[in-house]
Amino acid sequence: MAIKNHILGFPRIGLNRELKFALEKYWSKKNTLEELLLIGKNIRKENWKNQIDSGMDYVTVGDFAWYDHVLNISMMINNIPERHNPNNHILNIDTLFKVARGSKGVDNNICSASEMTKWFNTNYHYIVPEFTSNQKFYFAWKQILEETDEALSLGYKVKPVLLGPLTYLWLGKVKNSKINKLDLLKKILPIYIQVFKELSSRNINWIQIDEPILVLDIPKNWKKEFQSTYKFLDGKIKILLATYFGDITHNLDIINKLSIQGLHIDLVSSKYDLLKLSKSINNNFLLSLGIINGRNIWKTNLLEWFYKLKDFMKINNNFWISSSCSLLHVPLDITIEENLTDFVKSWFSFGIQKCLEISLLSQVLQNNLDIKELKNWIKPIHEYKSSNIVNNTSVQKRTLKISSEQFIRKNEFSVRSKIQKETLCLPVLPTTTIGSFPQTSEIRKLRLDYKNKKINQLDYEKQIKIHIKKNIIQQEQLGLDVLVHGEPERNDMVEYFSEYLEGFVFTTYGWVQSYGSRCVKPPIIVGDISRITPMTVMWSKYAQSLTKKPVKAMLTGPVTILCWSFPREDISKEDICNQIAISLRDEVLDLENSGINIIQIDEPALREGLPLRTHEWNNYLRWAVKSFKICSSGVKNSTQIHTHMCYCEFNDIMPAIVDLDADVITIETSRSDMELLEFFKTFKYPNAIGPGVYDIHSPNIPSVQSIEKLLKKALKYISIQQLWVNPDCGLKTRNWTETSLALQNMLQATLNIRKEYFKK
């Protein structure tokens, strides 16, 4: 019997977000490159130690990234947009950051960052590779070798990991050219061979190559390339081909013909019959079984898996046990949590605990530990199910009573829009922001002091109102048409709302990486959800009292709250979403009754939640759209409902977006140079739309000319009566200098376009 333990990847930000703080200090020139590199090295060292101490046979190397692991491959093969490296200089870490964050080029011209979008259906974001004609690729960035040498020098058995060449090409975009991405394979594969040779010379036996596109419905020409690609790569080192996030049975005909030595399958995302599945897989492959959920934080029922694997061992006793996918998507360590009770903590496994689960199951299977260890491990699972925290009968009854009348607006958009124009009196090309304003150190300290009970509620509310007043004054001075209160009271767009909802619990240190230095702390849904008290009414009502201009209230939508939380697993996502939607409906109606005429319900995760297989889309979109409409449809015709979406491809779900029936939708488009709007050549969007005119994720200040250019491009596809003007996203991560200058330019560009329009 030979069972090995490993994981596909490990959280990379450090126990206390050391990577985040080191990056931000480096970008603001508050620490040196040497200091940054040392912190990265220490994080990797600690990660590998944690894996070995938790019983892994291999340490996974190559999962660390300064910004993003897809960008690591772009650096490795020298796929750097010319604007960021016009003279083809030797690459360094600053090149990487220029691609990710944008920079100033020759003559102080702004070089835009590469696009950023969601990694499959997760809340992690990757930097989209750009492909152009006549690119020259070579082995330019040797991070994978340097980190392998680091781990070897510490005496570890190393399993390197790289994103596979076909998935890398699939995720990229062709820019200003008509090349076929697959034609680039012949240029890229020799670099992978170079890496394999280097690793082989270091006596590395296995390399993990991630090809998650094998869970998708990939076209025939892509399927065809898999066989020739892996035949080309065969021979230098054993390949463990890793698939995750879904079912691969529809692509087994290709996979079984590949020249690989091992196959990782995600047994969590798709509920396979393991015995049946194994009989349909090439019996020459070593199987890596992904049985520990890498995307959620609940303990695994190891006893259930013990019996399944005992049966499996009757036909195959040579396999590996692993996480379903990289543990990048979960926090690092549950044991450091201070504000959860031991009873609640016992339900969860974070990154380190997931490694322990793999090891524990492996040891019992190999008779090194008694089965009672598994029974003890799963006791909290049974205690959770019977806990009074979980079930709320009044919530369940209200959810069952949802009727079709509750998710239909009183009149169609053409009727509503006329009434809203009379109510709001907005100009052509109305200007607004997405919601948040800079979260200064003063604001963060204020919230922390209140949380730690250093100031009382009365003083806290007084100080928050001072910040709201500053935000309103600033916006009026700038000349924005629709104002926001700026969200100084909000720590996070999901956590803030979940704190007002029964059914959630919260961690103190449960951070996960979203992109680069951006980390989020997802709340955990443990029970039925209901609103405890109004969540935003007081702040929006106060902001509206300060101005005659309309103030827009901001809520996070039900799908996004679901997708950006760790959900419970005992009921369906549809049921969870409906519970959230009912709570938000109550909030929307309270806002309307308080005199708020514009209410924005953000759904940036709508596309992210889409299943990876197209045949499952309709069912998901049915309940996702329904949940939005439950929130939004109880209002009067005069109340304008907005929604906001970012980081995603909208075109394939545009009918569903229309079905939301929001009066105004704002979307992120600036990084793609309004590319998303190409869809509107053939599709007439019926309601109003605000494509983002500048990238808030970059510190670069957009020029008036660049914004005018984007607005003119948008006007080719959208009528001026439908078009709104706004940044791509909220401004919480920017400072006030950047924010003011960018908004000034946005408003000037809008005035220029208005003048030009009225001259015609």
Curated annotation (Swiss-Prot):
Alphabetical list of SUPFAM superfamilies matching this protein: UROD/MetE-like (SSF51726)
Catalytic reaction annotation: 5-methyltetrahydropteroyltri-L-glutamate + L-homocysteine = tetrahydropteroyltri-L-glutamate + L-methionine
EC number(s) from the headed UniProt entry: 2.1.1.14
Binding-site positions, Zn(2+): 644, 646, 668, 729
Binding site for L-homocysteine: 434-436, 487, 602
Keyword Repeat attributed: yes
Cofactor binding remark: Binds 1 zinc ion per subunit.
Physiological role: Catalyzes the transfer of a methyl group from 5-methyltetrahydrofolate to homocysteine resulting in methionine formation.
Protein name as annotated: 5-methyltetrahydropteroyltriglutamate--homocysteine methyltransferase
Organism name: Buchnera aphidicola subsp. Cinara cedri (strain Cc)
Taxonomy of the source species: Bacteria, Pseudomonadati, Pseudomonadota, Gammaproteobacteria, Enterobacterales
